[in-house]
Amino acid sequence: MIFNRYARGGGGGGLGALIYVTVEAGSTVTATMGTMTRNAVYSQGVYVIDVPAFGDWVVTATKGANTATATISVTKAGMYEVTLSYISKTLNDNDWATIKSVADESKGANYWSVGDTKQITINGKVSDGLTLSNYQTWVYIIGFDHNSAVEGTGIAFGGFKTAQTSGIDVALCDSGYNSNKTSGQWFNMNNSNTNAGGWSSSRMRSTTLPLVKSALPSELTSVIKTTTIYSDNTGGGSDVASYVTATQDDLYLLAEFEIFGAQTYANSAERNYQKQYAYYVAGNSKVKYRHDSTATAVFWWERSVYATDADLFCGVNTNGTANNHGAHYSSGLAVAFKI
């Protein structure tokens, strides 16, 4: 994975073009172009390759089962520098910066699989009824370059699980769970029982999710990208196609069609701009449990309004089926984001 590269004055023998490779000591480093291969010499902490011809050289570093590559365009005499980093096929062994570098090149599926997990620690107030202190949980891949023609590229993650493998799917729940809240900061969609304004104007989007984001680790939030998502952003009780418009979001909730691959209560036009996430295409459970009581299944929110009702937003029922709830009810929270 390339972190930086550039040419500068100087050079070696022959052609006068050298590639300097910074990578873990003990690696084997080569450069290849067509039928030509050159081996690197380790010198003073870097690997040096003296290339005999101009062109695009593929630099490969290997160490054990790990491999890292970069393509260097050698166009003139001089020194070309590249830093390579090995990418672990165990998602959790990579830092967020490395995951972002893979996502930026749309190569996530080359290393990881849908459902792979990475641990995070949440610290801080996320609701008037929930403050988390060193709460360790796992986010998991729900798609690679999901719906990229509409939403752009990236690795999409969902929350949350209790363990790296075979973990229980959980949603954050505050002390107001399953009760209506008309003031303060809770895991409700709005402080009044209305879906007017849809997703874009919801209190969940404008106030709650930014608060949740502030409690996430900075090394994660620094690489979360803004993504284009489509939702019913009008609400009010009518199933009107023009109500479905785009917003730009970093943290967001999944929509009904993105979870179920079918429309039950949501605006029937949302599906024209959405795709079901690969995690759910694969048949994974849609049931989530309380983060603090993992034997208790919960209703968790979606961003879709119930199109033909002025009071309700869609969600996933305790048995994993499509359902809906009054907008002012505090319910389970499971965020999504893209890197």
Which role does the model predict for each range below?
Residues 53-64:
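A short, solvent-exposed beta-strand micro-motif common in secreted/extracellular proteins
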Residues 83-339:
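Collagenous Gly-X-Y triple-helix signature in extracellular proteins
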Residues 25-29, 55-57:
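Short beta-strand/loop motifs in extracellular/secreted proteins, especially
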Residues 1-16, 66:
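Short, low-complexity N-terminal tether/leader segments at secretion or assembly junctions of large
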Residues 64-86:
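Structured interaction patches on ligand/partner-binding surfaces of diverse proteins
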Residues 33-51:
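Short, acidic Ser/Thr/Gly-rich low-complexity loop/linker segments typical of extracellular
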Residues 16-25:
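A short, amphipathic beta-strand motif
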Residues 45, 53-55, 78:
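A glycine-anchored, Pro-Gly-centered beta-turn/N-cap motif
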